[in-house]
UniProtKB/Swiss-Prot annotation:
Gene3D superfamilies: Hexapeptide repeat proteins, Tetrahydrodipicolinate-N-succinyltransferase, N-terminal domain
UniProt organism field: Serratia proteamaculans (strain 568)
GO cellular component, one term: cytoplasm
CDD domains: LbH_THP_succinylT (cd03350)
Protein encoded by which gene: dapD
Coiled-coil intervals: none
Catalysed reaction, written as an equation: (S)-2,3,4,5-tetrahydrodipicolinate + succinyl-CoA + H2O = (S)-2-succinylamino-6-oxoheptanedioate + CoA
Assigned protein family: Belongs to the transferase hexapeptide repeat family.
E.C. designation(s): 2.3.1.117
Database matches in PANTHER family: 2,3,4,5-TETRAHYDROPYRIDINE-2,6-DICARBOXYLATE N-SUCCINYLTRANSFERASE, MOLYBDENUM COFACTOR GUANYLYLTRANSFERASE
Entry binding sites for substrate: R104, D141
Keywords, comma-separated and alphabetical: Acyltransferase, Amino-acid biosynthesis, Cytoplasm, Diaminopimelate biosynthesis, Lysine biosynthesis, Repeat, Transferase
Annotated protein name in UniProt: 2,3,4,5-tetrahydropyridine-2,6-dicarboxylate N-succinyltransferase
Length: 274
């Protein structure tokens, strides 16, 4: 694996010179191998090690290099044709392979090659970009987008129109991460490498980026870039120091543990916020 990483790192240093016409065989094979390993879930761009999320930057570099070494080509879809550098993940799947891998894909959901979809996942008409990882038992609902290299945990529900930001455009240092057992409400956006920790509930229409203030009304603490585990979060505003205006924020209205989540439905958690 170290040899593979070295090839990717060296190629990335001269990426501006690489084109589909001049990409050497060693680089091309290394990039294709990484994309295949990401596609199968054998590798992932970020993983939790000793309780901390670690980003494997070289894998992200391999994803970026794949755009340098591949030319656009015509691809056939169910209702149209496509012209792109990245093949569709399911282009060569037959019924036996879908059954073996154990997830559902509702037309016209689109998944790019290099994204991993785990068992018991349901993809409604949605979009999952290259390098993303969607773990077991999750639902990607209608018109939701899972951005490049984003990490989605087990038993996560991404509601209709949710946007989970990617790392490639604009280039970000770390992927956006939604940990296990989270609920992201309709039309919410989580971007710029924000981490939503395990068991959190994000209400409809909440926007979270690195500069978004995440205000805990119980403690008065303000978080940036991280929603603490078990938080129930809604949209809000915080006043300026002189009270002349207010600016958008996200508000942690309560904390819940796994036992409470198991007994109480998501809707009830969001409705009883007083």
């Amino acid at each position: 694996m170290q040899q593979l990483q070295n090839v990717i790192e060296n190629a990335f240093e001269r990426r501006a010179e690489i084109t589909p016409a001049n990409a050497d065989t060693v680089t091309r094979e290394a990039v294709n191998q990484v994309i295949a390993l990401l596609d199968s879930g054998a590798l992932r761009v970020a993983e939790k090690i000793d309780g901390q999320w670690v980003t494997h930057q070289w894998l992200k570099k391999a994803v970026l290099l794949s755009f340098r070494i591949n030319d656009n080509k015509v691809m056939d879809g169910a209702e149209t044709r496509y012209y792109d550098k990245v093949p569709m993940k399911f282009a060569d799947y037959d019924e036996a392979r879908f059954q073996k891998e154990g997830f559902r894909v509702v037309p016209p959901a689109t998944v790019r090659q290099g994204a991993f979809i785990a068992r018991n996942t349901v993809l409604m008409p949605s979009y999952v970009n290259i390098g993303a990882y969607v773990d077991e038992g999750s639902m990607v609902d209608t018109w939701a987008t899972v951005g490049s290299c984003a990490q989605i945990g087990k038993n996560v529900h991404l509601s209709g129109g949710v946007g989970i930001g990617g790392v490639l455009e604009p280039l970000q240092a770390n992927p956006t991460i939604i940990e296990d057992n989270c609920f992201i409400g309709a039309r919410s956006e989580v971007v710029e490498g924000v981490i939503v920790e395990e068991g959190s509930v994000i209400s409809m229409g909440v926007y979270l980026g690195q500069s978004t203030r995440i205000y805990d009304r119980e403690t008065g603490e303000v978080h940036y870039g991280r929603v603490p585990a078990g938080s129930v979060v809604v949209s809000g505003n915080l006043p300026s120091k002189d009270g002349s205006y207010s600016l958008y924020c996200a508000v942690i209205v309560k904390k819940v543990d796994a036992k409470t989540r198991g007994k109480v439905g998501i809707n009830e958690l969001l409705r009883t916020i007083d």
